[in-house]
Amino acid sequence: TIQLSLPYRNMGLSGRVTYAFDDRYFFEGNFGYNGSERFSEKERYGFFPSAGLGYIISNEPFYPESLKKVVSKLKLKATFGLVGNDQIGAKEDRFYYRSEVNLNNGSYGYTWGNDYTGLHSVNGVSINRYANDDITWETSRKTNLGVEIGLFNDLELQVDVYRDYRYNILMSRASLPGSMGLQASIKSNLGEAISQGI
């Protein structure tokens, strides 16, 4: 289709701020404000912030020197953020807010005539995709908690617990009755998925 030959147009604005105090307290904040051509005007832009904190307890004055000989480093950290994804569906479904109509579908045409006059056929019209102004960014909410432990100034261990909750996953609606007379499947941001672990 012609839409595959068009240049892709996306916009993005991003920013970051970092702060560290006395080699003990750390903060980092990021954001992305992104626009995608794939969605309608009301859903085109998404704001995706993230933040991270770090705390090195072993650098505190109250941290015992006797413990420091064994646990030479003890750091706690946490991050939380949102990530947006506009690369959803097939590449042919580039503009979800527009219908895609096939004006030359032989499966929906008609034929007339007979063996004596000759058979004549004309291709028909079919709908491949209905316009949907409500399709939007698939979003992932990521959370991570971790600890870094240094032993004897030589060995370092890291343990992280993470949770990734994805929502607004693009899926086909399965509960529409055939009596509605729709030719193409209806897609919406219906799906959810969770992954978590250590």
Placement of each model-derived feature along the sequence:
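Extracellular/periplasmic, surface-exposed regions of secreted and cell-surface proteins
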Residues: 1-198
